[in-house]
Amino acid sequence: MSAYPKSYNPFDDDGEDEGARPAPWRDARDLPDGPDAPADRQQYLRQEVLRRAEATAASTSRSLALMYESEKVGVASSEELARQRGVLERTEKMVDKMDQDLKISQKHINSIKSVFGGLVNYFKSKPVETPPEQNGTLTSQPNNRLKEAISTSKEQEAKYQASHPNLRKLDDTDPVPRGAGSAMSTDAYPKNPHLRAYHQKIDSNLDELSMGLGRLKDIALGMQTEIEEQDDILDRLTTKVDKLDVNIKSTERKVRQL
């Protein structure tokens, strides 16, 4: 004789403690005994499997939406890093220009110190105009790794928006995009058309999640490289600013001594 009541839900066994009593069937008819009991039990199991498949498909769709949202945030942060790189490079160029101008000023001051040599040196050694650096004429670009990651994510985002308008929910009228399960044999899916559609949707979402996580990884690695390169720029800029500050103070002292 069975140790369980005649009506219990085997799906609830996994979530129960060993000492807990089996949960009763959550069915209006409570699966009464009779000649139709096996058929009723089988029908309930089909409905339960279908319900859980639907919930899983909806869960993977939500996860996919969150993944794409995270990717958008990553792209926006990467683009902000690229703009910051441009600011740093322009600042470094301005500091270099200030240093060149200061050197010219120091030459003039040294020339003025000598009454006779001043005029001769002034006209003899005119300030040499330094040609603008080629980097200053180009638009600042992030490192290639980050640039490719941003481009790939933007292309995929456009495809996602086209194929997932308003994060459309899976239902009986729109079970799954055609061809979503083409990569697998149809024998691998259940014969029930609705259940098959849910399984195909789940597989499609998981495939997209896998590729999306790969793109997120590329963005993260690209941002890491970009931050390291910008740290190098900051180190150079700090050194140049400190040197410029010393030269400015030295020039001020020379001017006061005139």
From Swiss-Prot:
Residues 76-107 form a coiled coil. GO terms for cellular component: autophagosome; autophagosome membrane; azurophil granule membrane; centrosome; ciliary pocket membrane; cytoplasm; cytosol; Golgi membrane. Residues 1-41, 150-191 are annotated as: Disordered. Gene3D superfamilies: 1.20.5.110. Belongs to the SNAP-25 family. It comes from Homo sapiens. Found in brain, heart, kidney, liver, lung, placenta, skeletal muscle, spleen and pancreas. SNAREs, soluble N-ethylmaleimide-sensitive factor-attachment protein receptors, are essential proteins for fusion of cellular membranes. SNAREs localized on opposing membranes assemble to form a trans-SNARE complex, an extended, parallel four alpha-helical bundle that drives membrane fusion. SNAP29 is a SNARE involved in autophagy through the direct control of autophagosome membrane fusion with the lysososome membrane. Also plays a role in ciliogenesis by regulating membrane fusions. Forms a SNARE complex, composed of VAMP8, SNAP29 and STX17, involved in fusion of autophagosome with lysosome. Interacts with multiple syntaxins including STX6. Interacts with EIPR1. Interacts with STX17; this interaction is increased in the absence of TMEM39A. (Microbial infection) Interacts with Hantaan hantavirus nucleoprotein; this interaction prevents the breakdown of the viral glycoprotein N by virus-triggered autophagy. The keyword Disulfide bond does not apply. SUPFAM superfamilies: SNARE fusion complex. Keywords: Autophagy, Cell membrane, Cell projection, Cilium, Cilium biogenesis/degradation, Coiled coil, Cytoplasm, Cytoplasmic vesicle, Golgi apparatus, Ichthyosis, Membrane, Neuropathy, Palmoplantar keratoderma, Phosphoprotein, Protein transport, Transport. It is linked to Cerebral dysgenesis, neuropathy, ichthyosis, and palmoplantar keratoderma syndrome: A neurocutaneous syndrome characterized by cerebral dysgenesis, neuropathy, ichthyosis and palmoplantar keratoderma. This is Synaptosomal-associated protein 29. It is found in: Cytoplasm; Golgi apparatus membrane; Cytoplasmic vesicle, Autophagosome membrane; Cell projection, Cilium membrane.
